[in-house]
Amino acid sequence: MSAVNENNLEGVSETVLTLRKVVVNESEPLARRFRALFSLKYLACLQPPSEDTLPAIEAIAAAFSSKSALLKHELAYCLGQTRNPDAVAFLQQVLKDKEEDVMCRHEAAEALGALGYEDSLEILKALKDDENEPEVIRETCDIAVDRIVWENSEARKAEKLKPSDFTSIDPAPPMPLEAAEPSIPELEKTLLDTKLPLFQRYRAMFALRDLASPPDLPTAVQAVDALAKGLKDPSALFRHEVAFVFGQLCHPASVPSLTECLSNQEEAGMVRHEAAEALGSLGDVEGVEDTLKKFLNDPEQVVRDSIIVALDMAEFEKNGEMEYALVPDSGAPAAVSA
């Protein structure tokens, strides 16, 4: 694929140009770059696509030159949510780059799985079976292959899935609805069974997530407690996904587990960073902001960066702002100051 052309921006709208300048600028505060990214994501995800959609995808991809692993991994996540084939080549390039940060490569693999295009299977299968690759890459590619196969299967068309409160394209769908809905203990058993394929365990994870939303659902606390047990799993990839789900749920019952995870200096950076951002989404819960501030000078860069973003998110939660972006996630995008 050709690299993002920085010189061919003729005809790109002022909104996209302004957001692009922010997201690629290493001198901009990280929190502001994240807000610009989520604004570009809104444009990149438009269905049907608008004249801003491809330029927004290219603007997101242009920021892969950043030094921030945290930002780059979020770029990959956002491209995976676009349902747009124009994002595939950018993500494949990131995944193939052995010099790229592992967390970013993992997110690119997961994003290719979310997009669901079969032309990504070749690279994903090759890396899944490459013993020279880090475990997190092999595991992510394994799940991504299973998701793409599922996405394009006849079995998927026959499945009935419970409607979800969440619009995200997840690494795996929730468990299908059978004659009787699986109980939380049954889902927990699948979630924690390390002998099962990761894709199947992820399906249990997202089924539990959907039983924990909205937070006043009678099953919510029990489902959160079941998910929390997944934070003790031997797989760092699995633990990080549990923390991500907690960030989606914003359930106060997850705060103790997330705090323990963030506080564990022996925990993998990709897990601690996800715990930090999940706590940021719970910023209106008493004590969370003070917990986050304790890690502003953490030895690990990705954790420090996550704390900056998490505190910005916490401030956003406390202020009751409508959208964590420089333009809204719904309605017509507005211009922003450069």
From Swiss-Prot:
Its EC number is 1.14.99.29. GO terms for cellular component: cytoplasm; nucleus. HEAT-like PBS-type repeats lie at residues 71-97, 104-130, 200-233, 238-264, 271-298. It is found in: Cytoplasm; Nucleus. Pathway: Protein modification; eIF5A hypusination. InterPro entries: ARM-like, ARM-type_fold, Deoxyhypusine_hydroxylase, HEAT_type_2, PBS_lyase_HEAT. It is an enzyme of class 1 (oxidoreductase). Its cofactor is Fe(2+). Keywords: Cytoplasm, Hypusine biosynthesis, Iron, Metal-binding, Monooxygenase, Nucleus, Oxidoreductase, Repeat. Binds 2 Fe(2+) ions per subunit. Fe cation 2 binds at residues 240-241, 273-274. Pfam families: HEAT_2. The keyword Mitochondrion does not apply. Its main location: cytoplasm. It catalyses: [eIF5A protein]-deoxyhypusine + AH2 + O2 = [eIF5A protein]-hypusine + A + H2O. Belongs to the deoxyhypusine hydroxylase family. Catalyzes the hydroxylation of the N(6)-(4-aminobutyl)-L-lysine intermediate to form hypusine, an essential post-translational modification only found in mature eIF-5A factor. This is Deoxyhypusine hydroxylase.
